[in-house]
Structures are given as structure tokens and as C-alpha cells.
Amino acid sequence: MTSPGWPAELTRARLHVVTGKGGTGKTTVAAALALALATGRRRTLLVEVEGRQGIARLFDTPPLPYEERRIAVAPGGGEVRALAVDAEDALLEYLALFYSLGFAGRTLRRMGAIEFATTLAPGLRDVLLTGKVKEATTRTEKGKHTYDAVVLDAPPTGRVVRFLDVTRAMAYLAKVGPIHHQSEGVVRLLHSADTAVHVVTLLEDLPVAETLETVAELDLADLRPGVVLINRVRPPRLPTRSVPAAADGRVAAADVRAGLLAAGLDLDPAVLDGLVAETVEHAVRVDAERQTRTKLAEAGMPLVELPELTEVGVDGVDLGGVYRLAEVLREQGVR
């Protein structure tokens, strides 16, 4: 079994990789984590690598370029910057840095050679993307890390292990030279205690099943699982002792009516029938969520729960909701 909350040992991690099945709110949770980690005059970088511009939409800013820009102020004077990493731009930066091909690289891009290279070479795109994340995570200025933490809004669970572990294969393919050293550096970071991979899920069968599969794959790939972030948790409206009977359809309408009458409410029979049906439906959901939560707990990973919010926006949450989720994360120990 596991314990709830953010483990103290994760305070060492400098790179937080956030993945999850599509539709679980992965981008929103990654943004909230970046805000939580920036609280108290700290600086974090929120990175996306899939070209969706989800961060820009969530923070209501123009599309992010291939440069780090401040997008939010965290409580206590902290700062969140964001970066949309593009494989073609990363390759141009790589060519300019290691081969002094700045102008020539731009010419190659106009000719379509850069897109061709990142499409043709298996794994090269992911090496470039993770290489840029590694550079930002390890970068220093005046003897201090530029960022206290980097949060990566990673590909979904079905692709994340391949995305994170492709650098190991590339390191074997390139035995010498800059690409070899870059791959080795990325491998060291991603397979160290400085990196934690968090999985966002919902208390539903399919997301939970995919979460458990991903945790097992991370272990096999020697990638460090962090926490399971259970998103959109709804509070139960029934006493725990009443859930099993109600979920089984055993709700005494006469008793409900008597209780309502005692409270001064005389409902139409049709309305009462609807109320009883909603009670049964709610109890069925609560019981199903209890079972999926038990499956997650038995996997042994720490669990962090985030409430369902009603604000509308990306993933069903607006910017105010992101700040609220960041506050909840801080309350559960995120530092």
C-alpha cells in the first residue's frame, strides 16, 4: 500500500516529467505543478514538446516561440517561464553550437533539409527535444542553476517511455562526437534521482489501467516514477456506511420522504423518484472510484489528489483554477 501526499525525497528532483492518458488534464496539472514549485521567490520553467501550444492557451498568451518567456508570477514572488521546444529549432541550435553552422543551418531549413533530417532519423527528434530540456535543467548562471525546477509537459502515457528512453538507443548508435556526448548527458539526467516522472490519472477504469501499465514500464526502463496525480476528484455526498447499499439500489424511498417531510420539504412523487435515482447513480460512481483508488494504492506509488474545479478553460479549468490547484499541491507537500 501507499501513503498520500508528496514524498519529501522529491524535493531533490530538478526535472519533473508530467504524463497522463489523453483527457486527464495533463497540461493543466503540469502548469499547476510549475506554479507550486515556483512559490516563494523561486523560478521554474514549464516546457512543452508536442507543438500543441497548450501552455499558451491555458495562460491566455500568444503562441510560445522557441525562447523562454515569463508567463506567470507565483505566490511569494516566484516566477514561471515557459518554452515550446521545436525539433527543427533545436537542431538548428545544435548545428550552430557544435558545428558553427548558424547561417548554413538556416539555409538548410529553407531548403527543407532540417525537417527531412528530423523526420528521417529514427529517434533524432526525441533526442533533440529531450536534449533541450536537459540543457535548461542543468544550465547555470553565476554558479547557480538558472531554474530551481523544470516541469516537462510530456507526451501521453502511450508514448512517454519511448520518448524518455530513446536517448539510450541513440547513445549506442553514435559512438563518438557531440551527439554521443549529448545523448549520454540526457541519459544520465533522466535515469537519475534528479528526474521524477509523474502520471496524471482519473478515478476511471481506463485511465487507471493505463497508469498502472506506465508505472510498470517506467520501472523496466529504469526511469524513476514520482507520484500519481489523481485529477478531478469529486467529494462523496453520502456517508461512507451508506454507499454499498445505495450502490446496490437499496434506497428506501419512504425513509427519504419521511426525512424530507421532517425537514419541511414535501416533494412531488416524480421528483422524489428522480432524487432516489440520482442517489443510486452517485453511490455507484463513488463505489467504482473507491475500487480504482484501491488499485492505485496497491501499486505502491504515492498518491496526490486534486479536486474537480468548475471554472471553464483548457482541460475544463481556467487560469484561476490552475492557481487553486497549485495551492492544493503546496498543501500536500510540493516544494
Report residues per predicted region:
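Pre-Walker A (Motif I) flank of P-loop NTPase domains
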Residues: 11-16
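Conserved catalytic network of the ASCE P-loop NTPase/AAA+ motor domain
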Residues: 10, 36-40, 74-76, 139-145, ...
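Short secondary-structure boundary/capping segments
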Residues: 60-64, 99, 166-170, 215, ...
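Walker A/P-loop NTP-binding active-site region of P-loop NTPases
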Residues: 19-85, 164-167
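A conserved catalytic-core segment of Leloir-type glycosyltransferases
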Residues: 68-108
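Phosphate/Mg2+-binding loops and adjacent switch elements
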Residues: 102-213
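Conserved beta-strand segments of the P-loop GTPase G domain that flank and frequently precede/overlap
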Residues: 19, 47-48, 153, 198-202, ...
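C-terminal lobe/tail of nucleotide-utilizing enzymes
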Residues: 1-10, 191, 195, 205-335
